[in-house]
């Protein structure tokens, strides 16, 4: 009977990317995942936050590419929301305006417009503002230039009693940098990239369009990897693109993040010798070749 199980958990993120988690599991987990019995501890809640971050990053790379835009919207003092919920209402209204205006101006259907926005505040004394991603699928380059101007112009509010508008503040729409989104551009945004930067805000509420594609989790493979291969992946071959290409033919390494034991996955039941709690874990993002 096999004693050592290393789980390979693959998640397809749209047509172009795949995330893979590699970590040791117990024989009980290999047979079936048990029901959660206890409330999360503080440490586990912290891990759940990072897990949520990774899920959002996977969702972002499944839906947005270099033809989309990363948005940052700020408020002038006169329009600064009172709290995060009021900020969320402004973000929801902005999403509605973007979808309606895009359909009208470019003659596209709503399902072509993908939106993932956050109302955020960094720290208790920080100012409320907005970050997020927007993309309209199938646009020509000339249309994207016009779309970008429209995204910046729609950060506004109607002047009561008139048909005129005034800006809520500043809105910057920049082309999505996939290296920043993936977290492999070497900047201060860190290993979780743009989404990690957004999650660095103490208060945040996500507002999404309903048509976003969900990453697809594949059935786990618990017998493909050995402990020695896991150590190799987390050690000498962590950043070796050729080696990862041989492990996953047809895919190219984008990044590999090595975690301390139990940071990526924590076994709910430990085996007697407890070896799985001492094993390194890694999280890999790959892009499809061609």
Description of each model-found segment:
Residues 1-128, 136-290:
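Right-hand nucleic-acid polymerase module
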